[in-house]
Every structure is written in C-alpha cells, then in structure tokens.
A protein has these predicted regions:
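Structured alpha-helical
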Residues: 1-103
Length: 103
C-alpha cells in the first residue's frame, strides 16, 4: 500500500479554472498542501499544467494556485500536484488544513 508524505483531507469544495474563452468549474477533494483530486468536465491530459482557484469553506477569498500539473487522469477525475503557489496562499492553505485536523 502506498504511503503518502502529506496527509490528505477528505471534503468537497468548489474549484474554478479561469480561462481565456470560458471558465470551467469542478469539485476538489482529498486536499493536501501539495495537491488534490478533482472531478470536472474540463478535459485534461497527464502532464498538462493549469491554474485554478479553490473555494475553501468558510473563507471569503478563493485560494489561488498559479500552476498545477495533472499527474493522473481517469474519466472526469484527475489528480493535481501544486507546482506554483504564492507563499501567502500556501500559508492560508496550511492554516485551513490545520483547522480540519483539529476538528
């Protein structure tokens, strides 16, 4: 069984992929400090890099991930690894995940 380096938190939240022509939404789950699982109608392929915004519950501002890479894909589900995220955004994510851990 694979052991992960970073704990994943199982909950669902809305995500948004801003685009030049059209923006696409989806649902994120299994969130960690380095990535998440996504379900969306947005077509992707392994290795594709994209920007996204995550609507974290209880927070007014979306969490912006400047660049994430698709690491696996199966149908409308795929795994993203966060490659570029601002230091303030990363700290917001860490604080949010620590509140989930505290229960």
């Amino acid at each position: 069984m694979e052991q992960r380096k970073h704990r994943r938190y199982r909950f669902h939240c809305e995500i948004w992929f801003p685009g030049k022509q059209v923006s696409v939404t989806g649902t994120a789950s299994d969130l960690s400090v380095i990535g998440c699982k996504v379900e969306s109608k947005k077509r992707v392929y392994i290795g594709k890099c994209l920007a996204l915004q995550i609507c974290l519950p209880g927070q007014e501002a979306t969490l912006k991930v400047d660049q994430a890479a698709v690491r696996w894909a199966k149908g409308q589900e795929y795994g993203l690894e966060f490659l570029t995220i601002g230091s303030e955004e990363e700290e917001r994510l860490r604080r949010f995940l620590s509140t989930l851990e505290a229960g």
